Each structure stands twice: as C-alpha cells, then as structure tokens.
C-alpha cells in the first residue's frame, strides 16, 4: 500500500525528489557504462537496480512527509472524580513493580527523581480548579500532586501512533449522569414519585426543588462540550506542534459512575435486575448527543466501567453486601457497547481488571491494626503514656501485623480511599493504558 500524499506541498516535494533522482541517473550514465563494462555486467541491470533503490528512497521520503502532514489526533477525556485522578505522586514509585507500568515512570521523572514533561502530548484540562494547559506531566490529576488516567493513556497513545497527540480533559468530582452530565435530548431530570413524596415529607417546595434540578440538568454536559469546542479552536494558536498543523477529533473516554451507582432516590430498584436500566439508556443517548454536538457521528468512544474494589467475584465477606449493586451497575455501564448501532465504535473497559488485590488485602489488615491501636490507647494502662511511649506502642502493634516489606508496599502504593482506586498510581496508569488499547483497536 503506497503512502497517501496529503497536500500540494507534498506533491511538490516528491516531484523534486524524483527530478533529482533522474538527474543523478543522467549524470552517472557514462561512469555506469564504464563500470558495467569492467564488471561484465549489463548497464541495464545496474540502471534497473539504481532505479529501484531510488524509487524505494522516494517512497520512504514520501512516507515521512505523509506522517508529518497527517492531522494530529485529539482525544477527549471526560467524567467525574476518577477521571480527575486522585493518585498522589508519592505512589509513582510503585509503577516499577509492574512490567506494564514500569516504563511510564521514566516519562515523568528523570534519573534524579525530578519531574519532567512529555512534550509529544499536549493537554488542555478543565476541572474544579480551573483551566490547566501544557505538556503532559504530573499535576493533571485532581491537584498539582496527582495524576489520573491521562498519564498512562497519553504515553501509550503517543507511542503507539508514533506522533504527537492532544488530550482535552474535562472532569469534576461528585457529578452524575442523571443530572449533571445529562444529555440534552433527554430533557431536564424529573423527580420520580418516591422523590416527590420524600420532598413533601421534608416540608420542601416540590416545584421549587424541581426548578432547581431542571436548571442543573446538563450543566456539566454543556461545560465539557463547550471546553472541547473552545480547545479545538485554539489548538493552532496554543499547541506546541505548529500553527500549520491540522487537528482532528479522534476519540473520547467516558469514566464516571459513582454518583449514579449510590443514588437510591434516582435508582430505587438498584441491585435488582434492570435497576440501572435508566443509566444505560441515558448513556446511550449521551453518546448520540455528544457525537452530534461535536460533529463526529462515528467518534470512537471508550466507556470506563466502574471497577473500584476489583472483580465482584473476589470480594471479601465484608464486601458481599455490595456485590449485587456493584455488579448490576457495572453491567449497566457496559451495556451500550453491546448495541448493534455502536458496533466497532464503542468499547467498554472493565477497570476492575486494573485493580491491585495485594493492596486491597494490605489495606484490609491495616483497618484491623488501627482498631487494635485505638483500643490499646484507650485502655487504662495506656492513658498515662507519653507521646514517645504511645509511638512505641503503635510501632510494636504495626510490626506484629506487617513485615517491613508489606508496610512499605502499602505506604508507597496507597494515597486515597477505595472509591478513588486507592489513590494508586499503578492502578490509575493501568487504567489509562487499558483505555488506550481499547481506543487503538477502533482507530
């Protein structure tokens, strides 16, 4: 398959290459004849060989020109707190524990541990902290010290495509699909009968409450789509890849769900078969609306399916009471990817497969250790202890429960709660890489 010439400039440069090649052959015709005579080889054979080499060289040059001229791909990352990312930079060292994530560390830290940027990935991120732009680095998470899926995704995509890319990120913590990201074609959220009766019991004005909810419906949908349009319009001016480049919207990642999963008012039958069907319908409509509003009817979309806690089948006994709710919601999130109308253009990624079961077990043991520490410190014998003695008691209990290696693994791997994927850089980078692999399969 021959490379495609994308512009008149490419045609002109290729023509120049061919003209030079022809001139070289003409200039070397007499020396080639003498060489062929001395080597007892036909001039036609040598001439044909040089033509073939010249042709291949021209194709190679054209391939390079085609890569340079091809539009720069732009990917949108949108969702709530886990798309923001709560993995603290102090957990980055744990990336080295996994061959999949280990190479990422060298992209954001040099040999001395100082932070560096990945110049091939440009980011425009809108979140609760405002607008942040620049080359991909630590700090595009929920705060300056945190990362989200953008790190693993950006590194993997730019390497796989072997060209610069742009990420447009829009994420806010605590946001729902049923109201905050509600697709415009679904109309404003309307309270169900159970919610109306609850409002009346609380002595609240139902009409006023409905008006407030209607006003909030789709607010963050509009925020995110406006951010995408504005960012695309400014890329030629702001991105470091040159004003002469073209940019094309190439894919979108949706990573949200917690606020819908825990809302028993909106989903009163949650945990029951079909209890989250409304979420599936809303997400299907959201995808259609997004494609229409972004003028990208076949935009590849990856659904990041909620997976905090890991696979439900591996839940401990104390987690089993959540199993039905968690699994039914995950199934509802993934459902749109199974629709025939979205075949080959929407894929679901089960982020539960990126979970770290070792960290789960260590965190579980830490809870019991903390309970033991609190009980001992409240005992009559411990009330008279000084600060140093209390610290010694904590250390004694810790060493009884954990080896030093286990304790180091826990401290270097966890920085947040389970619903934020433990604030683990290793988990978050795995998720980003998984998103990239799914996206690459659709490009």
Language-model regions: role of each:
Residues 2-11:
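Short, intrinsically disordered low-complexity segments enriched in Ser/Thr with adjacent Pro
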Residues 7, 21-22, 38, 42:
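Serine residues within intrinsically disordered or low-complexity segments
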Residues 23, 33-35, 55:
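Aromatic (phenylalanine/tyrosine) cluster motif
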Residues 41-57:
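Bacterial N-terminal signal peptides that target proteins for export
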Residues 69-443:
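Cell-envelope and extracellular/periplasmic
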């Amino acid at each position: 398959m021959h490379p495609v010439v994308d512009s008149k400039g490419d045609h002109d440069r290729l023509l120049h290459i061919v003209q030079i090649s022809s001139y070289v052959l003409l200039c070397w015709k007499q020396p080639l004849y003498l060489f062929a005579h001395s080597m007892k080889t036909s001039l036609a054979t040598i001439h044909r060989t040089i033509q073939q080499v010249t042709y291949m060289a021209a194709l190679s040059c054209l391939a390079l020109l085609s890569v340079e001229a091809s539009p720069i791909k732009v990917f949108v990352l949108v969702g709530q707190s886990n798309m923001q990312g709560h993995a603290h930079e102090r957990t980055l060292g744990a990336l080295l524990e996994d061959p999949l994530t280990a190479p990422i560390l060298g992209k954001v830290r040099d040999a001395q541990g100082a932070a560096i940027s990945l110049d091939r990935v440009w980011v425009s991120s809108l979140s609760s902290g405002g607008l942040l732009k620049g080359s991909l680095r630590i700090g595009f998470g929920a705060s300056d010290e945190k990362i989200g899926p953008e790190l693993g995704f950006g590194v993997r995509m730019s390497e796989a495509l072997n060209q610069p890319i742009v990420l447009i990120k829009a994420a806010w913590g605590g946001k729902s699909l049923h109201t905050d990201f509600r697709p415009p074609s679904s109309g404003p959220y309307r309270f169900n009968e159970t919610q109306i009766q609850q409002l009346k019991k609380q002595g609240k004005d139902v009409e006023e409450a409905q008006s407030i909810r209607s006003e909030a419906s789709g607010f963050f949908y509009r925020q995110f789509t406006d951010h995408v349009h504005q960012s695309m319009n400014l890329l030629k001016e702001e991105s470091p890849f040159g004003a002469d480049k073209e940019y094309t919207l190439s894919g979108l990642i949706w990573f949200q769900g917690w606020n819908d999963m825990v809302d028993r008012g909106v989903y009163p039958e949650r945990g029951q078969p079909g209890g989250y069907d409304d979420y599936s319908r809303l997400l299907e409509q959201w995808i259609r609306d997004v494609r229409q509003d972004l003028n990208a009817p076949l935009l590849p979309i990856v659904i990041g399916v909620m997976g905090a806690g890991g696979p439900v089948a591996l839940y401990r006994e104390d987690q089993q009471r959540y199993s039905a709710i968690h699994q039914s919601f995950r199934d509802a999130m993934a459902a749109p990817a199974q629709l025939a109308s979205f075949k080959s253009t929407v894929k679901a990624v089960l982020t539960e497969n990126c979970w770290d079961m070792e960290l789960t077990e260590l965190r579980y043991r830490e809870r019991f250790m903390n309970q033991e520490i609190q009980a001992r410190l409240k005992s009559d014998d411990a009330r008279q202890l000084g600060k140093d003695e209390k610290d010694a008691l904590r250390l004694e209990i810790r060493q009884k429960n954990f080896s030093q290696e286990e304790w180091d693994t826990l401290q270097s791997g966890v920085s947040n709660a389970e619903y934020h994927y433990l604030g683990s850089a290793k988990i978050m980078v795995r998720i980003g890489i998984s998103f990239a692999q799914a996206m690459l399969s659709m490009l």
